[in-house]
Amino acid sequence: FVYLPEMPYRKVDLDKAMRNVLTQEKFTEDGGQGNVAGWLNTITVENVHPSTTVAIRMKGLAGETDDFKLYAYGKDGKLTEVSKNLWKLQTEDGKIPEKLSEDTLYEVHVTVEDGGTFDLSDTEKEIKIAVVLGN
């Protein structure tokens, strides 16, 4: 359910990738706005470039693409909205849909800086992100 689109030859260790339920209450308490709209995806990727794009596959999304926001946990344990220029929601073939359908597989591509705001890992050349969609 996760891969590195810029480095398809590099496999993500699925033992270091998790999908968990994030309750609406916890989402709001931690700083999310609106409704939680998917799984909390926590992913660790080793031996990365200074800036790495991570792609997360997901289904069950419906509504207008522009209504969705991506939130990421920071080291302070709070959710922060990820800037639109750092992520996109697309189909598997790279198209940006206007409307989402629950039975279609989508990909969230998020760019993370090693050691940046949304990198939860203190290890150099390793990123750990925890992201969730809201709408």
Spans of model-derived segments:
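Extracellular/luminal ectodomains and secreted, surface-exposed scaffolds of diverse proteins
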Residues: T80-S101
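Predominantly extracellular/luminal regions of secreted and cell-surface proteins
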Residues: F1-N20
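Generic "edge-of-domain/loop-turn" microfeature
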Residues: Y9, R19, V48-P50, G63, ...
